[in-house]
Amino acid sequence: MILRTPQPKRLRSDAGESPFPTGATGSGNQLIIYEDSPLPAPAPLQTSHDHSADQHLCTYQCRQMVKADVLDALSTAEKQVEESKTKLQTLNANFTEADAERKHFRDKFLYSEQELAAAKAREKMLQEQLLMEINNSQERYTKELQSCHELEVKLQNEMNLRKKAESSAATAEEKAKLLEDKLTQLSGSVDREKKRLNNDIAQLGKEAKLSVARIGADLERMQCRAQNAETESNLLRSQLEHLKLIFDECLQEKTEVDKKLSSFTSEAASSSDNSVLVKHLQEELKRYEAEVREARKLKSRHLDAELLNVNLLEEQSRRERAESELSKFHDLQLSMEKLENELSSWKSLLNDIPGVSCPDDIVMRFSVLQNEVVQSTMKIGEASTRIKQLEETLEAIQLGRQNAVSEAALAKEKSEALKTDVKRIEVMLTLVTEEKEQLKAVVNELRKSNSEGSVSGAADGALIQGFESSLAKKENYIKDLEQDLNQLKDVNNRQRTEIELLNEKLVDEARRNKSLERDSDRLRSEISLLESKLGHGDYSAANTRVLRMVNTLGVENEAKQTIEALQAELQKTKERLQAVEELKSQSGDAGKLVDSHITGKIAQLKEQNATLEKREERYKTVFADRISVFRRACCELFGYKIVMDEHQRPNGIPVTRFTLQSIYAQSDDEKLEFEYESGNTSILNNEYASQGDIAKQIEIFIRKFNSIPAFTANLTMESFNRRTLY
C-alpha cells in the first residue's frame, strides 16, 4: 500500500463530474489513501471514533499539505510564466502596432501641418481678395453716389424743364379750351340754325302737304270735269253719228227728190200738187239744214271739249312744272338762307379770330395755328419722352443703388463669414497645436520607454488610450473640416445661384430696356405720323365738325334725274293720249292702228314669254343637275337614298313626304317614310317600321330621345354589320 496525494484539481460546479463527494474535500484537508489499484469509490476515514489514528497520521498529513502547497505554487508560477510570455508577445505586437500608428500619426501630423499651412495661405488670399472686394465696392459705392448726385442734378434740371413744358402745355390747353369754347359756341349756333331750319322745313313740308292736298282736290275736280266732258263727248258722238245717218238719209232723199224734180219738170210745169210737194220738200230741207247746223254745233262742241282736254293736260303739266319750280324756289330760298347764315357765322368767326382782317387771312391764320399746335404737340412729345427717359434713368439708378446696397450687404456678410472662418480656423489651429503637443509628449514617452528597454502594461495601456483619444480627436477634426467644406460648398453654390439669378435679371432688364427703346421709337414714329397728319389737315369723323350743304351735287343730280324721268313718263302719257284721241277721231284708221298695236304688244309679250320659258327650262336643267349631284352626295355621305314627294291634305295644308332606303338594305321593302309639315318631322308606320327591332329603335331614339339622326345612324350600323359580318 502506497500513500499518495493526488494533484490538486479545480472543483467544478457540477457534482456528477467530481470523483469525490464535496463533504470529503471540504472537511479540513483529510488524508486519502490510494493503493496500486485504487478502488473506484474509497470511503473517507472516520476520525471521530478513533482519536489515536488521527494522532498517528498528523505529521504525514502536514507533509502532504506542504507538498501540495509547493506544488500549487509551482503550478501557479508556471502559469504566471506562460501568462507573462503571452503578455510579452502581445506587448511586442502592441509596440509594433504603436510604432506603425506613431508613424501613421506622424504622417497625419505632417499632412495636417501642410493643410494648416495651405489653410493659412488660403486665408491670406481670401483676406487679400476680401480687402480688394471691399475696396472695389467702396470705390463703386463712391462712384454710384457721385452718379446719383449727378443724376439728381439732372433730374432737378429735367423737373424744371418738365415744369416749363407743363406750363407751356397748360397755356396750350387753355388756348385749346378757348378754341373748344368757340367751337362749342359755333356748334351751338349751328345747332340752333339746324333747329330753325328743321322747323322751317317742317312748316314748308306742312304747307307743301296742304298745297298738294289742295292741288289733289283741284285735280280730282278737274278729273271729274274731264270725265263729265268725256261722257258728254261720247253722248255727242253718238248723237253725231245718229245725225250723220239721218243726214245721209236726207242727202239720199234729196238726191232722189232732185231726180224726181228733174223728171217732173219735164212732165208738168206748174200744178198745185207739185207746189205743195215743193213746199213740203223745202220745209224738210230747212229742217234738215237746222239739224245739220245742230250737228255742226255738236261737232264744234266736241272739238271744243277735245281742245279743253288738251288745254287741261297742258295746264296740268304747267302746274306740275310750276310746283317743281316752286319746290326748287323753296330749296333755293333755304339754300340762300343757309348761305347767309354761313356767311354770318364766317363773319363772326373772322371777328372772333385775332389777327384776321379779311377772308384771305384765314388760311394763313389756320396754317399758323396748325404749326403752333404741331410745335406744342412736338414739345409735349419731347417732354413726355424726356420724362420717360428720366423715369427710366431713375429706375436704373434705383436699381443700381439697390444692387450696390445688396452688394455691400453681401460684402459685409462675406466679411463676417470670413471672420467667422478665421476664428474657426484659429480654433482649429489651437486644437491642432494641442494635439501636436500631445503627440510630441507621446513620442517623447515612447522614446523614453524605448531607451529604458522595458515597458509596463499600464504605460502601454496609457499610450494606447492616448493614441486612441488623439485618433478620435483627429477623426472629429476631419469630420469638422468636412462639414466646413460642405458648408463652404453650399455657400458657394448659393452664391453661384444668386449670381446666375442676378445675371438672368440683368439679361431681362437689358431685354426690357431694348423693348422700351423699341416702344419709344415706335411712339416717336407714331407721334411724327400724327404731326404730319396734323400738318396735312387730316381729321377724324368723331372729333371734327364738317359744314355740309343741304342740296349737295349728288342730291341735285338725283333730283334732276327723277325730274327728267317724270318728264319722260309724262311725255309718253301725252303721246298715248294723243294716239287715243287720234284713234277716236279717226274711226276708220283706229281699228287698224289698234290691231297693229295689239299685235305688236302680243308679239313682244310672246317673245318675253319665250325667253322666260327658255330661262326657266335652263334653270330647271341646272337645278336638276345640281339636285341629282346633291342626292348622290347625300347617298354617299349618309348612306340613304332620299325620294321627296309633295302633296296636300284635304284641309289644304301642304305636306312633304320623304322616303329613305339604306344602301345596305337587303330588299326593296326596307324603306322608312317621314312626313315634314311646318317644321315638324314625324315617322310613318309601314311594314318595315312595324318590325320588332325597328319599332324598338323607333321607340328609343325617336319617341324617347327625339333624335332621328341617331336612329338612322344606328340602323345604318346594324344593316352594315348584317351585310358584312354575318
UniProtKB/Swiss-Prot annotation:
This protein's encoding gene: MAD1
Family membership noted in the UniProt record: Belongs to the MAD1 family.
Name of the protein in its database record: Mitotic spindle checkpoint protein MAD1
Coiled-coil residue windows: 68-246, 272-625
Summary of subunit composition and partner proteins: Homodimer. Part of the mitotic checkpoint complex (MCC). Interacts with MAD2 and NUA.
Pfam family, one: MAD
Subcellular location: Nucleus envelope
Stretches the record annotates as Disordered: 1-30
UniProt-listed GO biological process terms: cell division; mitotic spindle assembly checkpoint signaling
Function according to Swiss-Prot or TrEMBL: Required for the execution of the mitotic checkpoint which monitors the process of kinetochore-spindle attachment and delays the onset of anaphase when this process is not complete. It inhibits the activity of the anaphase promoting complex by sequestering CDC20 until all chromosomes are aligned at the metaphase plate. Required for anchoring MAD2 to the nuclear envelope.
